[in-house]
Amino acid sequence: IVVTFAIEEEVIDVPLKDAFIVPIVTGIGKANAAFSLTRAVLLEKPDMVLNIGTAGTQKHSVGDVFVCDHFIDRDLSLLNLPGITSELHTEHLLFNPYGVVNTGDDFVTDSEVLHGDVIDMEAFAEALVCKRMNIPFVSVKYITDIVGKNSLKAWEDKLSDARKGYEE
């Protein structure tokens, strides 16, 4: 199992019995995530990919955890061009999925209304890599901040809480 984290501060132990875990730090953003995950998939040939990370929200609470099956690329969704994939689902690959991730290459700090339960910068890219390579993908997000409420500072302050929350 390849387990992805955007930054070193998000890395936690993932104790899955009888599983060989390969943790990778992808870097922030869709391009870094897609590159790092593709390289890891080609080298490791995993049975599945688990993305663990932090995210913001507009409608839930700090400390909530979401298992996500629906992914939106907020940057590509603005283009509305034929052949562009800006939304995908991975529910056929998961058990008991719920949650929508809205992914883009910006740290959202204003209260612009965005579709989704959680807002991040990597999950769509990783879901797309896995879907195209036919690898089961699970994304688990810990809410660290409420968009529009000093989001960047809140995210920085809550990183350690996210690690503790996942480990519980």
Predicted regions and their residues:
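Extreme N-terminal starter segment of soluble prokaryotic enzymes
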Residues: I1-V2
